[in-house]
Amino acid sequence: MNTTITSKDEILCVCRELIRKEGYKSINIRHVAKCCHISVGSVYNYFESKTDLIAETVASVWCDIFHFPDNRNPESDNPDSPDESKIFQSFPDCVAWIFDRLKQGEEKYPGFFSLHSMGFIEEEKMDVQERMDRSWFHIRQSLVVVLKNDANIRSDAFDENFTEEDFAEIIFSLILASFVQHDFDAKRIFNMIRKMLY
């Protein structure tokens, strides 16, 4: 058996491929070790338990689905620098990109979204949820950044009682509801955004 050290990222890459081809149930320490051509102990060097491995794999899948290429990271935008190119021309462009990524994610990882609807298995649910929340945090932050950079939004759209953060949270909740329902048609959300912001 090849016992050379394998990086955590390489193991997670194999786990993503397993989820894609064999489904969620294929993620266990022994099977992952076999597919990585490493010892079971080597997997435990990076993951304390099966729960830890599954939670990290789920977070890794979400990061793969919503990975911003280097030139499309909204958090790298400096709103005080007008010369810096913006990644999205408008907030609806950003939401369209998210829906497109969800659709591609469903195609790349068939059945993955259904796992979230079912809540995974009970003993792993909390840890997976916490890591999923962390991996989604950057999406919510990105929505806020894009809102603040969209020069076409009405000047009176936001105030101290209804902030960009509040609106981003509402839109994110609608996006999550759409993904749970496997509804990747964002037309109604776009209509709401246009009526409220422009």
Role assignments for model-derived ranges:
Residues 56, 70-108, 164-168:
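Hydrophobic alpha-helical connector segments
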Residues 12, 66, 92, 96, ...:
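Short, amphipathic alpha-helical "lid/cap" segments that border enzyme active or binding sites
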Residues 93, 97-141:
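Short secondary-structure transition hinges
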Residues 124-129, 133-168, 197-198:
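Hydrophobic alpha-helical bundle segments that form small-molecule/ligand-binding pockets
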Residues 10, 14, 18-52, 56, ...:
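Helix-turn-helix
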Residues 60, 64, 101-109, 146-149, ...:
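Phosphate/oxyanion-binding loops and surfaces in catalytic or ligand/nucleic-acid-binding neighborhoods
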Residues 1-6, 70-79, 157:
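N-terminal intrinsically disordered/low-complexity leader segments
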Residues 116, 171-175:
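Short alpha-helical scaffolding segments that buttress acidic/His motifs in well-ordered protein cores
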